[in-house]
């Protein structure tokens, strides 16, 4: 259910959940975009019993000032957000949060409140997935018209930059594009740091158990197929020095770590036969590794029950 109005009318929301159960369709798995301000515990319980496994919340911002400028009104209530997320997690639901950076009323200080909120929720294990967007004015909206009137749009920006996915098209005098871009990256990093805090203990325990199968002195190649904090924990828990195959950007962050011999960097993008050059493939073959370690962060396919 990919519309935020899915749960706006409480009676409809609960009736739909009951109808799903009555029709015998509660064995299926449902994901829904919901407005957290319109939810309550009873509605969440009914949804969970009907097969809902993941809720997507439009968190948007951790700043009251930005929320006011974005005219979020009653849809912005951080105490209610925390309450609903915590209760949803107690029911075993997955929580997906969407936030935006650089909107009207934002500044480095105000967007830092959003960054802090992301870290708080992730570090408590409340936030399973996140979508971070740069607040981008779309033609026809009040935001866009306001930016045009105040000459806040970069004249060099083409329409491909209006996707909110890492490109900044608005330049505030007090909050330049470079700082907005920095806040965007901080929000993504805050999620990673929070997940590391909440999951590192369990991850290390599982890693130690798995690595008992690898004899000391074995030649090991690790694929950088998980977040960098997981790679660091792998290196800490292995009894062997290893080589790493990964992307250029991750190599810069990981080089010099204890337990890491050399990094084979293939450029950018996901692992595939097309993304790795034939010369590098031949070099890896000549290394004659005893083990190739492919870390998987989601080996239970959490979040994909509906597939």
Give the role of each language-model region.
Residues 2, 58, 133, 266, ...:
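Conserved residues at the C-terminal ends of beta-strands
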Residues 210-220:
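A short, charged/proline- and glycine-enriched loop
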Residues 89, 93-98, 108, 121-124:
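Conserved beta-strand->loop/alpha-helix structural units within folded catalytic cores of enzymes
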């Amino acid at each position: 259910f990919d519309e935020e109005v899915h749960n706006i009318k409480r009676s409809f929301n609960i009736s739909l959940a009951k109808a799903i159960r009555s029709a015998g369709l509660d064995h299926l798995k449902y994901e829904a975009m919901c407005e957290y301000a319109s939810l309550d515990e009873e509605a969440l319980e009914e949804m969970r019993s009907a097969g809902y496994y993941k809720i997507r919340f439009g968190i948007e911002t951790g700043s009251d000032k930005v929320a006011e400028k974005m005219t979020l009104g009653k849809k912005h209530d951080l105490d209610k957000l925390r309450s609903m997320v915590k209760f949803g997690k107690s029911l075993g639901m997955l929580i997906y949060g969407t936030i935006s950076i650089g909107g009207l009323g934002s500044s480095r200080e105000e967007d830092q409140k959003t960054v802090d909120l992301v870290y708080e929720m992730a570090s408590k294990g409340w936030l399973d997935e996140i979508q971070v967007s740069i607040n981008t004015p779309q033609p026809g909206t009040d935001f866009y018209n306001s930016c045009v009137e105040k000459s806040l749009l970069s004249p060099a920006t083409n329409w491909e930059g209006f996707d909110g996915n890492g490109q900044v098209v608005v330049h505030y005098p007090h909050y330049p594009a470079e700082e907005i871009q920095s806040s965007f990256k901080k929000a993504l990093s805050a999620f990673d740091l929070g997940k590391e805090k909440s999951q590192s203990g369990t991850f290390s325990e599982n890693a130690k158990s798995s690595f008992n199968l690898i004899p000391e002195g074995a030649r090991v190649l690790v694929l950088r197929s998980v977040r960098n904090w997981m790679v660091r924990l792998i290196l800490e828990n292995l009894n062997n020095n290893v080589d790493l195959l990964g992307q250029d950007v991750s190599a810069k962050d990981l080089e010099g770590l204890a337990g890491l011999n050399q990094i084979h960097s293939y450029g950018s993008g996901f692992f595939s036969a097309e993304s790795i050059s034939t010369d590098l493939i031949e070099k890896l073959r000549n290394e004659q590794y005893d083990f190739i370690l492919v870390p998987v962060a989601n080996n239970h396919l959490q979040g994909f029950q509906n597939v």
